[in-house]
């Protein structure tokens, strides 16, 4: 098949959050799914010196956690969607994603049934519930595909700060078209014209005019309109 990108090098350590962005249809989601071995690749993807493609499926699942931009929620309670049968405290993860207040106001609380795919929740609520589950079952590497796309900026900032604390022992690869928080990323990957360039936010800002244009437009408050129905959620406190 045709190559989507080439000449891509990245080294990361636990505790780092790496922001990945680029123009529309640049291959962000494909890059994320490459870490799930859903796409063939040339070269090596190594964790602790072990090649990803050489691991068993169980080893891969134990190494990489993935949250897609379409939350996969079950027709079950808020609690069970987070815990998936584990013995843990779901409240901690609801607080981390700024969803605890809204759940507390629901008539059935954590026992509220969310419907297949979270149809009984708003887009932002479903997104935060799926992120809470991902954090409850976190892996050494977490791939998060546009996890904040349905959130307002204030909630996004709070959830990001909590993510850094809860995932301090993981490598987080955050794919996003929203760049508010990219100055806080430990590394930024910019995808353009089939190439992926790694650097700090400042380095990418200086080197790539399109990245600078997108970042400055959003920093000035000219955020691109969400394509999701209903627009960004405003989390209740």
Question: Where in the sequence are the language-model features?
Answer:
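Catalytic Walker B motif of ABC-type/P-loop ATPase nucleotide-binding domains
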Residues: 142-146
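Conserved ABC transporter NBD signature motif
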Residues: 43-51, 60
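ABC ATPase nucleotide-binding domain helical subdomain, centered on the C-loop/LSGGQ "ABC signature"
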Residues: 44-46, 79-116, 160-161, 169
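C-terminal portion of ABC ATPase nucleotide-binding domains
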Residues: 161, 165-168, 183-237
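The feature captures the beta-strand-to-loop junction immediately N-terminal to the Walker
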Residues: 21-23
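Helix-to-loop junction immediately C-terminal to a conserved catalytic motif
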Residues: 35-37
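Conserved catalytic motifs of ABC-family nucleotide-binding domains
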Residues: 39, 65-87, 149, 181-182
């Amino acid at each position: 098949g045709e190559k989507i990108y080439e000449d891509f090098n990245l080294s990361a350590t636990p505790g780092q959050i790496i922001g990945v962005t680029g123009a529309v249809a640049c291959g962000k989601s494909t890059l994320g799914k490459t870490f799930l071995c859903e796409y063939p690749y040339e070269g090596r993807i190594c964790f602790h010196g072990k090649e990803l493609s050489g691991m068993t499926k169980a080893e891969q699942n134990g190494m990489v956690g993935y949250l897609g931009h379409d939350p996969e929620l079950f027709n079950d309670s808020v609690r069970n969607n987070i815990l998936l049968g584990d013995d843990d405290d779901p409240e901690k993860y609801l607080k981390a994603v700024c969803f605890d207040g809204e759940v507390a106001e629901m008539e059935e609380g954590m026992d509220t049934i969310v419907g297949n795919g979270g149809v009984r929740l708003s887009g932002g609520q479903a997104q935060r519930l799926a992120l809470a589950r991902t954090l409850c079952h976190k892996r050494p590497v977490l791939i998060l595909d546009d996890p904040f796309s349905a959130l307002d900026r204030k909630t996004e900032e709070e959830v990001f700060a909590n993510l850094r604390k809860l995932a301090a022992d993981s490598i987080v690869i955050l794919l996003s078209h929203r760049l508010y928080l990219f100055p806080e990323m430990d590394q930024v990957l910019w995808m353009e014209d089939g190439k992926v360039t790694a650097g700090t936010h400042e380095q990418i800002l200086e080197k790539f005019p399109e990245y600078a244009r997108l970042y400055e437009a959003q920093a000035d408050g000219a955020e691109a309109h969400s394509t999701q129905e209903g627009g960004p959620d405003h989390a209740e406190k």
